[in-house]
Amino acid sequence: MVITSENDEDRGGQEKESKEESVLAMLGIIGTILNLIVIIFVYIYTTL
């Protein structure tokens, strides 16, 4: 009985970890896209 309750807690922790990882991955992707946009604008601005 104790083992199943520990597994339930572990499962909840893993779901939370998975959600945190997906949020961090999305933030990383958004940050990368914003960096590319800034680089493009700076390149265009400096070549004018």
UniProtKB/Swiss-Prot annotation:
Molecular function via GO: ATPase binding
Its Gene Ontology biological processes?
A: endoplasmic reticulum calcium ion homeostasis; negative regulation of neuron differentiation; neuron projection morphogenesis; positive regulation of insulin secretion involved in cellular response to glucose stimulus; regulation of cytosolic calcium ion concentration
Record keywords: Endoplasmic reticulum, Membrane, Neurogenesis, Transmembrane, Transmembrane helix
Does the keyword Endoplasmic reticulum belong to this entry? Answer: yes
**InterPro entries, per the entry:** TUNAR
Membrane protein topology class: Single-pass membrane protein
One cellular component term (GO) for this entry is: endoplasmic reticulum membrane
Keyword Transmembrane on this protein? yes
Pfam families noted in UniProt: TUNAR
Record field: transmembrane: 24-44
Ranges for the region named Disordered are 1-20
**Its function?**
In neurons, plays a role in the regulation of intracellular Ca(2+), possibly by acting as an activator of ATP2A2/SERCA2, thus increasing the efficiency with which Ca(2+) is removed from the cytoplasm. Inhibits differentiation of embryonic stem cells into neurons and inhibits neurite outgrowth, likely as a result of its role in intracellular Ca(2+) regulation. In pancreatic beta cells, lowers Ca(2+) levels in the endoplasmic reticulum and enhances glucose-stimulated insulin secretion.
Assembly state and interactors? Interacts with ATPase ATP2A2/SERCA2. Interacts with ATPase ATP2A3/SERCA3; the interaction occurs at low levels in low glucose conditions and is increased by high glucose levels.
Name-wise, this protein is: Protein TUNAR
Write down the species: Homo sapiens
